[in-house]
């Protein structure tokens, strides 16, 4: 049984993307997340047989992170969890899974593949999307907008976008850009502005920058936002 908690783990945050990787003597498991839209993300997980012999793999997902009072309903290849107190709708779709089921009103169990044989050097790719819409937003419209997107293409476009932005940032003539310690600060500033950006929602009519995750819960600071 492949238990992630017992294996070597690395976690990386790149501009616009999260990566987690787990390794043991038989398998490499890499999962990546990037944004499709301002309301939806794609999650791509790849398991590779690193050994010299076939490996049997059963691939399951379990989760229990939703509100206990959520209203759960099934959709094509997924589940919808609506939180009654504010009508927030979280939709998770497992595009490559065999079986998806709710467990109570706050959990799920997904059978991706059972007893799948993975030959030496071969890979299996799991794909899912997560969408969060707020009160008054059209969930069906958002799901339709991402339904035809190719997950691999989205990750390729994400990489191209951020590589182009970083190249543009570092292409100036400033003497400071010749020193790696300043180049790193510049890239970190870009990553912070990206991470702290918030799209319009509720009483906030325009996108802007949330100044910090620590000690500041909601809202936007205008003197940060004009820079974005």
What would you call each of these model-derived segments?
Residues 1, 18-20, 79-82:
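Short polybasic amphipathic segments
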Residues 11, 47-48:
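Generic cytosolic/nucleocytoplasmic N-terminal low-complexity/intrinsically disordered segments
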Residues 12-37:
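Low-complexity, acidic Ser/Thr/Pro/Gly-rich terminal tails and inter-domain linkers that flank the onset
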Residues 16, 39-43, 224:
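Generic hydrophobic, aliphatic-rich segments that mediate packing or membrane embedding
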Residues 28-29, 35-42, 48-218:
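Acidic/polar, glycine-enriched structural segments that form the non-catalytic walls/loops
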Residues 218-228:
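Alpha-helical support elements that line or immediately flank enzyme active sites
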């Amino acid at each position: 049984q492949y238990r992630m908690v017992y294996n070597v783990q690395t976690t990386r945050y790149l501009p616009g993307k999260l990566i987690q990787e787990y390794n043991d003597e038989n398998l490499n498991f890499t999962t990546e997340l990037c944004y499709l839209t301002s309301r939806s993300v794609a999650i791509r997980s790849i398991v590779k047989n690193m050994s010299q012999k076939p490996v049997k793999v059963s691939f399951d997902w379990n989760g229990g992170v939703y509100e206990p009072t959520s209203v759960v309903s099934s959709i094509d290849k997924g589940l919808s969890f609506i939180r009654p107190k504010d009508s927030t709708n979280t939709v998770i779709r497992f595009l490559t899974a065999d079986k998806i089921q709710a467990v109570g009103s706050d959990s799920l169990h997904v059978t991706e593949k059972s007893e799948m044989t993975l030959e030496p050097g071969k890979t299996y790719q799991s794909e899912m999307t997560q969408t969060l819409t707020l009160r008054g937003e059209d969930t069906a419209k958002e799901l339709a907008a991402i339904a035809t997107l190719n997950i691999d293409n989205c990750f390729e476009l994400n990489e191209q976008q951020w590589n182009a932005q970083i190249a543009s940032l570092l292409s100036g003539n400033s003497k400071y850009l010749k020193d790696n310690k300043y180049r790193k600060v510049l890239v970190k500033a870009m990553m912070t502005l990206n991470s702290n950006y918030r799209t319009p929602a509720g009483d906030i009519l325009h996108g802007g920058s949330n100044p910090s995750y620590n000690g500041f819960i909601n809202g936007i600071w205008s003197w940060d936002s004009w820079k974005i």
